[in-house]
Structures are given as structure tokens and as C-alpha cells.
Amino acid sequence: MSDEKYNAKLDQAGGKLKEGFGKISGDKSLETEGKVDKVTGKVKEVIVDAKDTVKGLAKGLDNKDK
């Protein structure tokens, strides 16, 4: 797993924790912040996956030309 993907997963996990603590404590602001962190982490993960796919396609096309 790349560092970028690992960090995206950490963002998602941290967001889940914040959201949970926000729910338990009744802190809507913390809960919302956690939800935002989760979504941000997921978006980062999707971007990393897309970059990996493009790199793989480019590499495949490179090998096809040889």
C-alpha cells in the first residue's frame, strides 16, 4: 500500500473516531468534522486508485509499443 493510500485510510479512520466521539458527547460540530474527514479520506483514496490505474494503463501501452 502506498503512503498516499495509507494516509487516506488514516484520515477515514480518524474521521470515524471523531464522528463517534461527537455522537457520544452530543458535539454536533465534532460529529460533522468527523464526517468531513471520512469523506475527504475516501476522496483521497479514490484519487490514488485512479492515479494507479492511469499509471498501469500507461505502462501497458508503453510495453505494447516495444
Curated annotation (Swiss-Prot):
Coiled coil: none annotated. InterPro entries: CsbD (IPR008462), YjbJ_sf (IPR036629). It holds the Pfam family CsbD. It comes from the Bacteria. Gene3D superfamilies: YjbJ. SUPFAM superfamilies: Hypothetical protein YjbJ (SSF69047). Disulfide bonds: none annotated. Belongs to the UPF0337 (CsbD) family. This is UPF0337 protein spyM18_1212.
